[in-house]
């Protein structure tokens, strides 16, 4: 049972601004998430059904929401971790 990855329109714009090397690193991790998206250690508090992918060396984060009914992973936000920027963006997009 594999999940499909989709992007919110605003998250796709953020994705396209990333360096290709960063995109490739995220793509590799997203592919793994398609098999098992519910990673307990990556679960975000305060945002329902959302998880994060961290790229420690570059400081980038990707926030995704898991929709089990339709087997979809929706990328909600992509950005730097600085001042919790990406997490604030993600929570704003659910309001």
What are these regions (language model features)?
Residues 1-29:
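Arg/Lys-rich, positively charged N-terminal/basic patches that mediate binding to nucleic acids
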Residues 2-6, 12-13, 55-60, 65-95:
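Enriched for short, Lys/Arg-rich terminal
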Residues 4, 27, 41, 50-52, ...:
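Generic N-terminal leader/processing signal
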Residues 17, 33, 65-66:
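Conserved catalytic core of Hanks-type protein kinase domains
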Residues 20-23, 38, 80:
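Alpha-helix boundary/capping and short turn/kink residues
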Residues 31-55:
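A short, surface-exposed loop/turn module that caps and links secondary-structure elements
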């Amino acid at each position: 049972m594999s999940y499909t990855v989709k992007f919110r329109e605003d998250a796709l714009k953020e994705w396209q601004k990333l360096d290709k090397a960063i995109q490739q690193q995220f793509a590799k991790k997203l592919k793994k998430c398609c098999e098992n998206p519910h990673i307990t250690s990556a679960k975000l508090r305060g945002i329902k059904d959302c998880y994060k992918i961290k790229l420690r060396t570059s400081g980038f984060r990707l926030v995704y929401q898991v929709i089990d009914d339709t087997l979809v992973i929706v990328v909600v936000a992509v950005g730097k971790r600085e001042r919790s920027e990406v997490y604030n963006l993600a929570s704003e997009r659910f309001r």
